């Protein structure tokens, strides 16, 4: 199963000049747990629900007073749509990520989340079992 099979095309984006309130509102309205932060129209960071909560806790300021530019720190890790979900999960686990940007060139075309993986766990398991069955046939 490929990353493109389980990520949606809708990506929530907000400018780094906006506030955390803007991003949290957009995330809530889109029923998603992440927001891409753009600096001058270029994807420059990934804000997750956990990041938002941590920023509130650390700063003690209202959401409207926290700028999104603090989250425009780049992408340490990303995956392309043609990679397997297993590969992407390996990246998420090894880097301690709850969400992974999906890039096509310089564009962010989606975000793979832990929720996406869990929602497709049955299909991933079925695919693994089928692949193991084929492997056993090939080895005969």
Residue ranges: model-predicted function:
Residues 27-30, 35-51, 92, 100-116:
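A glycine-centered beta-loop-beta connector
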């Amino acid at each position: 199963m490929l990353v493109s099979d389980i990520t949606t095309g809708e990506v929530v984006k907000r400018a780094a000049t906006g506030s955390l309130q803007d991003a949290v509102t957009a995330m809530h309205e889109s029923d998603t747990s992440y927001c891409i932060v753009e600096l001058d129209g270029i994807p420059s960071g990934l804000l997750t629900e956990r990041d938002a909560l941590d920023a509130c806790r650390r700063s003690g300021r209202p959401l409207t007073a926290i700028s999104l530019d603090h989250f425009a720190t780049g992408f340490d890790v990303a995956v392309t749509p043609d990679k397997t979900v297993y590969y992407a999960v390996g990246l998420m686990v090894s880097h301690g990520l709850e969400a992974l940007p999906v890039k096509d060139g310089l564009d962010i075309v989606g975000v793979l989340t832990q929720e996406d993986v869990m929602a497709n766990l049955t299909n991933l398991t079925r695919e693994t079992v089928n692949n193991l069955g084929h492997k056993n046939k090939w080895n005969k």
